[in-house]
Amino acid sequence: MSKIILDLQVACDHRCNLPSEDLFMYWLYMVLPLFRKKAEVTIRLVDEAESYNLNKIYRGQNHSTNVLSFPFKAPSPVKLVLLGDIIICRQVVEREAQEQNKILEAYWAHMVIHGSLHLLGYDHFIEQNAKKMEYLETKIMHKLGYLNPYETEIS
């Protein structure tokens, strides 16, 4: 049986429309046990200012972003369950969901799945890797009962 530890940090001013901690755990349990038996993840929900600062420092981008992932790599031969941190910007998620006609809960789920896959080593910088990552995201989203996150939803 898999064991996941979630450290949920809410660092944004407005807490309305945020998914519950149980939902975040549910989404993590749909991804992480496919790859690991044990994992510890921090999910930090932030406002645009913090997202902007982290995106500028770590990616050299001058804008806030929906999700950032910071995998933890333990030095060899240390084996830890700490997988890393997922930073999600509440305002960007809400805005993008509305602009893309996405169901807000489904978009939150997609950000958690996307961020989790980054922690597990997946990326989308090379087309072949992007296709594999998108396939996994879509498969997991379908298991959750959500539509393909890369297609526009009709409201």
Curated annotation (Swiss-Prot):
One GO CC term on file: cytoplasm
Enzyme nomenclature, EC number: 3.1.-.-
Alphabetic keyword roster: Cytoplasm, Endonuclease, Hydrolase, Metal-binding, Nuclease, Ribosome biogenesis, rRNA processing, Zinc
Name of a matching Pfam family: YbeY
Gene Ontology BP term (one): rRNA processing
Cofactor binding note from Swiss-Prot or TrEMBL: Binds 1 zinc ion.
SUPFAM superfamilies recorded: Metalloproteases ('zincins'), catalytic domain
Cofactors: Zn(2+)
Nuclease found in the keyword field: yes
Localization in the cell: Cytoplasm
Residues at which Zn(2+) binds: 114, 118, 124
Molecular function (Gene Ontology), one example: zinc ion binding
PANTHER family assigned: ENDORIBONUCLEASE YBEY, CHLOROPLASTIC
Protein function: Single strand-specific metallo-endoribonuclease involved in late-stage 70S ribosome quality control and in maturation of the 3' terminus of the 16S rRNA.
Protein family membership: Belongs to the endoribonuclease YbeY family.
Full protein name: Endoribonuclease YbeY
Originating species: Baumannia cicadellinicola subsp. Homalodisca coagulata
